[in-house]
């Protein structure tokens, strides 16, 4: 029987058929570079669109457009309530075009249309409206001073928050719309201008969203999009002297390179990088909760999630039960195209990434690791990798220490919780972790001792706009989200008045 597919909207096909350029100064236009980048549907491997491959001159045009918009105060100079209204209108337009954006996301990235609708658009709308509300909550403080000179003088002082300037937002390919808006919205809420560089693999939704931003009333030059390679376009953007802040989400290796570049100009930087995230399952945990929670926490978006649980440490009394449960769950997953409403595992984003993930599994198989695999997906089509459990892998295997970023999960037997903690923290990463237990005292103790920026108890990979998120160790620097989110996009100015 032919697997059902969601019908592609006519406006989506029309957008795919365009000759895409860049989005600079409030309008789409051609790049100076004549090079093009092909965009492929991961489910078929077929080209579906192309975009400009921007060069250094194109990036300079975008940054200078953002700079002119910033210094003219055409956005930062507006009343906070007016900026808030425009950003809420922007969110409303994204909601009105939600199915269009969800389909574009699935066609270029490969993920399930259900995930595109619920996460890429649904969660993005929550973040957009939350962040729009912060626009009118930016506040400084009044301060009492103890300056003794000249004798008898009195002082009044306060601080104020001012937008940092032009922001460079570097967006990964795993959640292009959602993570893109995590950079756009705080920048705009704070009064900054921004230049977004989406991944060259998945640039389409950011180009479309930029058009909606202009329609909402965001002034020309405030929101710009350049598409191109990291080596040329990304490097030119992060090294530009008029960029005041860089917000990057991606690999640790690339993040380190950006940090070195930023140091040359003392550019402010927020880095959300890789993770090799542990889950500790204690012997009193509810097996059903564990299997349901960690199947999502591990295999959401084919494991292409920085926060995914890729190492599961299970106390011995529960190990066999959970291995059996996970095996049954993995083998029941339906594998197919993202535009299929019934497929639960979809293709990886690109041929190159598919080959990389397969290399980890080939290495494990060569070392005679025990692999439990689900369905391989459609034969001869797309970039599919079967969801895979690796049981008690040798510590020397690459997949025990390196971020695989695919549908591959290690199940490891441990004698007790202390061994699990030692193994969980024995990594260069520190993005997320979880502990599974019905004992409140153990939950609190383990959440304290796990070395990760976010620790969940009896859940994994659940985030919220009001909860700060970021990494320890080599998983990054800085925090996104939460009521103080905009502090990272503002300068703090001190004002002192003698009277």
Curated annotation (Swiss-Prot):
Catalytic activity: 2-phenylacetaldehyde + NAD(+) + H2O = 2-phenylacetate + NADH + 2 H(+)
Matching CDD domains: ALDH_PADH_NahF
Entry keywords, A to Z: NAD, Oxidoreductase
UniProt GO molecular function: 4-hydroxyphenylacetaldehyde dehydrogenase (NAD+) activity; oxidoreductase activity; phenylacetaldehyde dehydrogenase (NAD+) activity
Residues the record lists as binding NAD(+): 250-255
Superkingdom to which the source organism belongs: Bacteria
Catalytic center residues: 272, 306
Pathway linked to the protein: Amino-acid degradation; L-phenylalanine degradation; phenylacetate from L-phenylalanine: step 3/3
Keyword NAD tagged: yes
GO biological process entries: 4-nitrophenol catabolic process; L-phenylalanine catabolic process; NAD biosynthetic process; phenylethylamine catabolic process
Enzyme Commission no: 1.2.1.39
GO (cellular component) term, any one: protein-containing complex
A Pfam family recorded for this sequence: Aldedh
Record-linked SUPFAM superfamilies: ALDH-like
Protein task: Acts almost equally well on phenylacetaldehyde, 4-hydroxyphenylacetaldehyde and 3,4-dihydroxyphenylacetaldehyde.
Quaternary state and interactors: Homodimer.
PANTHER family (UniProt xref): ALDEHYDE DEHYDROGENASE-RELATED
Family: Belongs to the aldehyde dehydrogenase family.
Comment field (misc): Can also use NADP, but prefers NAD.
Descriptive protein name: Phenylacetaldehyde dehydrogenase
Biological classification of the source: Bacteria, Pseudomonadati, Pseudomonadota, Gammaproteobacteria, Enterobacterales
């Amino acid at each position: 029987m032919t697997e059902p597919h969601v019908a592609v909207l006519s406006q989506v096909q029309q957008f795919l058929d365009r000759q895409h350029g860049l989005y600079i100064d409030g309008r789409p236009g051609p790049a100076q570079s004549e090079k093009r980048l092909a965009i492929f549907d991961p489910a078929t491997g077929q080209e579906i669109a192309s975009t400009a491959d921007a060069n250094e001159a194109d990036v300079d045009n975008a940054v200078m457009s953002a700079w002119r918009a910033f210094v003219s105060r055409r956005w930062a100079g507006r009343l906070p309530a007016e900026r808030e209204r425009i950003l809420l209108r922007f969110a409303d337009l994204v909601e009105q075009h939600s199915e269009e954006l969800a389909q574009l996301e699935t066609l270029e990235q490969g993920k399930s249309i259900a995930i595109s609708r619920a996460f890429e658009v649904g969660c993005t709308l929550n973040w957009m409206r939350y962040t729009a509300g912060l626009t009118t909550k930016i506040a400084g403080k009044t301060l009492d001073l103890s300056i003794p000179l000249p004798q008898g003088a009195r002082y009044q002082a306060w601080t104020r928050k001012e937008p940092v300037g032009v922001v460079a937002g570097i967006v990964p390919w795993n959640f292009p719309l959602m993570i893109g808006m995590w950079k756009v919205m705080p920048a705009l809420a704070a009064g900054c201008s921004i230049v977004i560089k989406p991944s060259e693999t998945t640039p389409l939704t950011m180009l479309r969203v930029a058009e909606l931003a202009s329609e909402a009333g965001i002034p020309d030059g405030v929101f710009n999009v350049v598409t191109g390679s990291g080596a040329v376009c990304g490097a030119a953007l992060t090294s530009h002297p008029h960029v005041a802040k860089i917000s990057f989400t991606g690999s640790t290796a690339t993040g380190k390179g950006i940090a070195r570049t930023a140091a040359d100009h003392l550019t402010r930087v927020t880095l959300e990088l890789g993770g090799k995230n542990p889950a500790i399952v204690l012997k009193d945990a509810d097996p059903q909760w564990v299997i349901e929670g960690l199947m999502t926490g591990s295999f959401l978006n084919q494991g292409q999630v920085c926060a995914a649980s890729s190492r599961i440490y299970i106390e011995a009394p529960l190990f066999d039960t959970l291995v059996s449960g996970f095996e049954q769950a993995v083998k029941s997953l339906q594998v197919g195209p993202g535009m299929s409403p019934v497929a639960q595992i979809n293709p990886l984003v690109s041929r190159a990434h598919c080959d990389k993930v397969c290399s980890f599994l080939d290495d494990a198989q060569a070392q005679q690791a025990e692999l439990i695999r689900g369905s391989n997906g459609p034969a001869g089509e797309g970039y599919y990798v079967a969801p895979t459990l690796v049981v008690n892998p040798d510590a020397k295997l690459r997949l025990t220490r390196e971020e695989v970023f695919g549908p591959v999960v290690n199940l490891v037997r441990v004698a007790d919780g202390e061994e699990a903690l030692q193994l969980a923290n024995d990594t260069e990463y520190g993005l997320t972790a979880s502990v599974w237990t019905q004992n409140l005292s153990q939950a609190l103790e383990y959440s304290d001792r796990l070395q990760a920026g976010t620790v969940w108890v009896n859940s994994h990979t659940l985030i919220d706009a009001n909860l700060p998120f970021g990494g320890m160790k080599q998983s990054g620097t800085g925090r996104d989200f939460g009521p103080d989110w905009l502090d990272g996009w503002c300068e703090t100015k001190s004002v002192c008045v003698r009277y």
